Curated annotation (Swiss-Prot):
Expressed by the venom gland. It comes from the Eukaryota. It is found in: Secreted. This is U1-lycotoxin-Ls1t. The lineage of its organism: Eukaryota, Metazoa, Ecdysozoa, Arthropoda, Chelicerata. The presence of a 'disulfide through disulfide knot' structurally defines this protein as a knottin. Keywords: Disulfide bond, Knottin, Secreted, Signal, Toxin. Belongs to the neurotoxin 19 (CSTX) family. 04 (U1-Lctx) subfamily. One of its GO terms (cellular component) is extracellular region. Disulfide bonds join C44-C59, C51-C68, C58-C86, C70-C84. It comes from Lycosa singoriensis. Residues 1-20 form the signal peptide. GO terms for molecular function: toxin activity.
Amino acid sequence: MMKVLVVVALLVTLISYSSSEGIDDLEADELLSLMANEQTRKECIPKHHECTSDKHGCCRGNFFKYKCQCTTVVTQDGEQTERCFCGTPPHHKAAELVVGFGKKIFG
């Protein structure tokens, strides 16, 4: 039973990994922004750094590319602004945990 769970976890990890290789659902304006930023970008944005101006410029982690995660910040004046940072989505963290656990068990 344990082997079946490990195999299923590895399959989920591989499917998730292959889906992270492609570009996520882009709208037309995001695609134009991506093309413009791709020409001027020289380095990727590291984990936990701000990616508000370049949402597709995050670096690659151990297994997956970091995703630009955004939140809305409200200032004391009541003005709302969007702030984004490169981070690991929860489902990628879970996949990395399963792979790490599998490496410990099977060496």
